[in-house]
Amino acid sequence: MPLFALLGGIALAGLYLPWLDRAPSVMRSLLKTLPVAVFALGSLIAGAPLLAAALAASALGDLALSRDGERAFLAGMGAFALGHLLYIANILQLSGNANPFFFEWAAIPFLLLAASTEIWLRPHTGALLWPVRLYVVIITAMGVLALSEPDAPLIALGAASFVLSDLLLAIFIFRLAEDHPARKSVSLAVWITYITAQALLAEGLLTQVSPG
């Protein structure tokens, strides 16, 4: 994507850091939403509308998750699920360097991690059980498919970073008490791995679409 969009999005992500643990506000929502929205704009300028759509869906998810309440959480999770489905569509459009053997090998850790959520996450999700389960299936599919492209390391790293970010977010939301001393550190790690994931996926997909 254009350098201004990549660096601008990263800079905006840095500006959001002091707002990570503040109460919801218009400014907090704006700062949380803008980084990936700028990535989306850069991807659109670079001639990748499907990638821009995936990033735009994620930006809407950021906006929803910047607010409090179950409805906002469900809206955010739905937006990110759509974003992952659009990432899947982007990956499927690649020229066809997928390695079936690598695909099967790469699936193992992702499937094991997804299955493990039935042990450490499911009992804590309450009424959100089935939305969370569906989201786990979708992001697992995106991660496995991304790792099936051995000639696209940025895509693989981006997907892995996204899975790590969502793993940490699940721990933050469902497993850590409000007064847990690790909450600030986990919140910071979620944001860093998330922005890293979006930047890597965007750059990786654009590189594959326009090699060289």
Report residues per predicted region.
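Polytopic alpha-helical membrane-helix bundles and their juxtamembrane interface segments
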Residues: M1-G212
